[in-house]
Amino acid sequence: MKSGFAAILGRPSTGKSTLLNSICGHKISIISPIPQTTRNKIKGIFTDDRGQIIFIDTPGFHLSKKKFNIAMMNNIHSSIGEVELILYIIDIQDTPGEEENKMLEIIKNSKIKFLVLLNKVDLKNTKIKEITQFLKEKGIEDSNIIKISAEKKINTEELKNKIYENFSEGPLYYPQEYYTDQKINFRISEIIREKAIENLKEELPYSLYVDIDTLENKKRGLFIRANIFVANESQKGIIVGKNGKEIKSIGERARKTIAKIFETKCNLFLQVKLKKNWNKEDKLIKRLIN
């Protein structure tokens, strides 16, 4: 029986959360085409007759001096220190740049075993040759590279085999039926946040957060009251929408997803509240990121 922890690293929107959800077979980490949707270290657990893999999905690696971004980068660095294996995902539609150079430098300096995953091989018009040459110049051996499609589950079985090859004998850290260790409040707040940013302006993901005010498991299903906090008045108007159209849509879509995931009816009530410049408050950022 083998077991261990594997950190999923990469630029924003490379497919890290998609890979986590795909392998674990459940919606664990929220997904959005908008970069840096993931803020926290999200654990996904895969168990089979060979053992157990605990995946840690991390925020997208992005070089920036903004306070919120620095906090997320600290999350990435702490994740590296907690694992036996690093899974570095590269989107083969993107040209390698400064982030790739820095990420490979961090990985090599960590002395931790790693695999490079070239994601989205199901798509056309990729930069696969350019990326392969880039990795060769960086001294990455072919045996450390796997071409995958997280969305289409191409070569994900090969990936799991490779992960187990890099793990040592060990116990199951979680019961077999577990697929995440996230608390229900966090999972529900993330679902609401996902629905809030799906059809809204790109700057909003970095300007809103969700707090669960009430969560009760009643005979008729889940009863939830939640607040969506924004940093300024104009953002509040965007989320509420004309005649409350947007917030109603967010609530309906979040309700359906929550009901499906937790296999129960869901009564969800949302409010949008203003908390000026919350994304500059160190204590709040630390709570949200950790």
Curated annotation (Swiss-Prot):
Keyword Cytoplasm assigned: yes
UniProt protein name: GTPase Era
PROSITE patterns with a match to the protein in the record: G_ERA, KH_TYPE_2
Residue ranges of domain Era-type G in the record: 2-169
Function summary: An essential GTPase that binds both GDP and GTP, with rapid nucleotide exchange. Plays a role in 16S rRNA processing and 30S ribosomal subunit biogenesis and possibly also in cell cycle regulation and energy metabolism.
Complexes and interactors: Monomer.
Cell compartments where the protein resides: Cytoplasm; Cell inner membrane
Chain intervals for the UniProt region annotation (G4): 119-122
Similarity comment text for this entry: Belongs to the TRAFAC class TrmE-Era-EngA-EngB-Septin-like GTPase superfamily. Era GTPase family.
Region of interest called G5, as start-end residue ranges on this chain: 148-150
GO MF, one example: GTPase activity
Region (G2) residue spans: 36-40
Positions annotated to bind GTP: 10-17, 57-61, 119-122
Top-level taxon of the source organism: Bacteria
Bilayer topology: Peripheral membrane protein
Natural source organism: Borreliella afzelii (strain PKo) (Borrelia afzelii)
CDD domains noted in UniProt: Era, KH-II_Era
Sorted UniProt keywords: Cell inner membrane, Cell membrane, Cytoplasm, GTP-binding, Membrane, Nucleotide-binding, Ribosome biogenesis, RNA-binding, rRNA-binding
Region described as G3: spans on this chain: 57-60
Domain KH type-2: 200-276
GO biological process: ribosomal small subunit assembly
